[in-house]
Amino acid sequence: GVVGNQGAYFDERDRHLIYIDGSLAVMSFQLALETLGLSSCCINWPSIFQLEKRMEKLLGLEEHERVVMFLSVGYPDPEGLIPYSQKKSVDEIRSYNNCQGAR
């Protein structure tokens, strides 16, 4: 799991920074994993008090530490498909307002 240390921030207003900083660090880590031929998937961890307490106990976290997310890592299926959505052309989505008579 990815754990943030809220004790590293000095002000209450910074309490959400562990999620931003943790996510940025994981993004770089995921890119590094790709260079090694590994795939990864971020797994959201909900901020629910009862779950937080259970996870603190399971991982032996300090009171100021919070789970940011989990990350699964493994080798990709060489025959796995990659999702693709065909984008609409500009002509399909562009429209013009009829401005005749407007003042």
Residue positions per predicted region:
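Acidic, surface-exposed loops and disordered segments
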Residues: 1-103
